[in-house]
Amino acid sequence: MGLTREFLRDLQELRRVVEPAGVRLAAQRATAQDLADIEAAYAGMKHAIEQGGDYVSNDLRFHQGLLRACHNRMVVQMSKALGALLRTSFEISTSRPDGPATSLPLHRAVLDAVIARNPDQAERACLVLIAGAQDDIEQVLASRRKLPSLAAPAARLKARVPPIP
């Protein structure tokens, strides 16, 4: 499947439709185990930025964990089906040198709102996160860099200094 500008915009639009509603439900329904799983994915993202590693796979675990935490079987199945597409979207949005470090606090804001059981804040934070990813994708598209293949393995980040708080 070829990645076109239109395809990526459609995918971001789908994310704006599904993820904020899923995160809203997660803020109401997440179990302690759900939160621990999402925290672990977040920690993996932070580790990848600070010490190098696979940011994108942890990013995918984070988002899929949030959708699993909504405890809606249809949303969970959709999340599984979209996994490869989301991974590719994350590969593109994190291909900017400062992309992962910029998006990490936005992820934290979503997670903190879910932990606080604040559905409105969780939904707003999710929309901000998706808007940031959309901006990153638009900048990558404008740069005319080669887009990753859907079949390519996740890129690994090099260590970044200093550590992120």
List where the protein language model places each region:
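Short linear motifs at protein or domain termini
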Residues: M1-R24, R144-L147, A151, A155-P165
